[in-house]
Structures are given as structure tokens and as C-alpha cells.
Amino acid sequence: QNANIYVDDTPAINVFELRAKCRRLAKQGIDLIVIDYLQLMSGSTEKGGNREQEISQISRALKGLAKELDVPVIALSQLSRAVETRGGVKRPQLSDLRESGAIEQDADMVIFLYRPEYYGITENEDGSDARGTAEVIIAKNRHGAIQTVRLRFLDKFAKFTNKDAKVLPPEAEQETRTFSSRINDDDDILGGLSPKTDDAPF
């Protein structure tokens, strides 16, 4: 209950509402903003644009928000169905980002999670066993190297560990508690004011 974690589950929140709430929270000090996930957000209320243009607007707005508040913004994104229909290797690529190339352009880093076993692949290209493994693919890194890191994936716990890490039985693991405070349950977080929907996203 003392953790500084704020959860906002407003359905189809738009970029203007999000920015207004983040600005309020910034006065109390925030270190990270996580969007889960980008395609669930809505853009401006203007009509006439398609979904790809709307996602592009959201992506640019999140980039502007990160710069304005000087905090990292992690935005989860869906992948295109083309990954599943593609023959051969199913490893995700930048072109698989759904509905917008703007995500690739705006992001400083793009990281994919890939589990070969999910697609029925049991052997990696180098001949190593792919079962129970996952890859963290750094597909874009504006400030560093592009590389892939292999991890162990424990499907029973939906947990990632280092490949050579010793796995403890569940009863031996330290109890973990999750704390959160909900933005929408705190009437004072926006000072009783509604965000201005006519404000520019960035």
C-alpha cells in the first residue's frame, strides 16, 4: 500500500487524458510510464482518419510525453497476424509491428519477446534445444547495440530466468506481494478537473 504505483484502467483512454494525468502525477514524482497496450488507446476525436493514422498520432504523442516529463515510456504493442502466417522462422521483425510504421520510427528501443515453442518449434537454427527457452530480441536501439538474449521460460509460472540459473521450487521462493494504488479511485489525482480534450498531444 506504500508503493508508488498508480494504475489507471480507463477504457479507450486517449492521449490527451493520459497526458493530463501524467502531468498531475509528475508533480509528485514519477520515474516510469507503462502503456498496456498501445492499440487500446484512442487518438484525437477528429473524424476522417484511419486507424493507422490514429496509432501514428498516439505514438508521436507518447514520444512527446516522454520528452516533456523526462521519463521513459514503455508502450506494449500488438504484432501483425503476418507473423503466424509466415512460413519458416516466426521470429518477429520490425515490420510486424501492427498498424503503424510510426512506432518503429518514434521508439528509441524496440524489444520483442519470442518463444519458438509457442509455434511448435523445438530446435533453434544452431541446433540447440528450443524447448523451455525464450529470446529477448533488441530489434532497435538508438543508443546501443542490437542483439538477442536467450533465457529460460518457466511456463508454469510465466517466469523468465537466466539459462544457467538454478530454479527453486515454488515453496522455496520468497513470497511476493503486489501493491498498487488506482488513479481512478483517487478523486484528487486530477484535482476534480476533467482533462482538456482540445489540447494538443505534444
Q: For the regions a protein language model found, what residue spans apply to each?
A:
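C-terminal regions of RecA-like/P-loop NTPase motor modules
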Residues: V15-I30, R60-L69, A82-F202
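Charged, low-complexity surface patches
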Residues: E54-I55, Q93
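Conserved H-loop
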Residues: L76-Q78
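A generic secondary-structure micro-motif detector
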Residues: R51-E52, K90
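Conserved inter-motif catalytic segment of the P-loop NTP-binding fold
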Residues: Q1-N50, Q57, G64, T85
